[in-house]
């Protein structure tokens, strides 16, 4: 499960190369490196589950997050391409795209910003880490053995594919 992720938000024209690279290297290059290590083991076993945690920002974009959005969109493309490469060896590769989840990062948002975000979520609330974890558990299970190359959206309806 590739779940590492950082943000270093800034408007595009103010974003430094360091802010761009730190986010891309952690979120996308880190996924590449970890997956490369575990894929070799999975190939030998002829079975595996690779689950990448992307973000609604990779699908919808988000002002001040060109680096983060690009890294998470890249992760979804990585997921689809790798699923095509590894599927013949009984290895599934999927991603989960959480929306706004109740975390330390969302706790510090100003109340007006939280209300604005929630107005875009048909279910009218933030998601929980347990709801994302339940989706991970499903993708890791035998019940998901015919699911590969897809992104599951866990966002209360904020984005509907």
Regions found by a protein language model. Name each.
Residues 10-13, 60-66, 88-89, 124, ...:
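Active-site loop immediately N-terminal to the catalytic Tyr-X3-Lys motif
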Residues 11-12, 19-24, 106, 117:
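Substrate-binding pocket helix/loop in short-chain dehydrogenase/reductase
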Residues 35, 71, 79:
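Active-site helix of classical SDR
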Residues 40, 84-88, 145:
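Alpha-helical segment proximal to the catalytic Tyr-Lys
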Residues 55:
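Residue(s) in the substrate-gating loop at a strand-loop-helix junction
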Residues 87, 92, 147-149, 155:
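Short, small/polar-rich loop/turn modules that mediate ligand/substrate recognition or access, typified
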Residues 121-132, 143:
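A conserved structural motif in NAD(P)-dependent oxidoreductases
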């Amino acid at each position: 499960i590739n779940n590492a992720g950082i943000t270093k938000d800034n408007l595009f024209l103010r974003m430094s190369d360091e802010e761009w690279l730190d986010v891309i290297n952690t979120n996308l290059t880190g996924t590449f490196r970890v997956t490369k290590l575990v894929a070799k083991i999975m190939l030998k076993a002829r079975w595996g589950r690779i689950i990448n945690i992307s973000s609604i920002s990779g699908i919808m974009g988000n002002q001040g997050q060109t680096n983060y959005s690009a890294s998470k969109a890249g992760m979804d493309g990585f997921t689809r391409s790798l699923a095509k490469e590894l599927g013949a060896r009984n290895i599934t590769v999927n991603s989960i795209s959480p929306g706004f989840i109740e975390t330390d990062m969302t706790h510090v948002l100003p109340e007006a910003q939280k209300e604005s975000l929630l107005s875009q979520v048909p279910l009218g609330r933030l998601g929980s880490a347990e709801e994302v974890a339940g989706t991970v558990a499903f993708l890791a299970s035998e019940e998901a053995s015919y699911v590969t190359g897809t992104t599951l959206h866990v966002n209360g309806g904020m984005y509907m594919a």
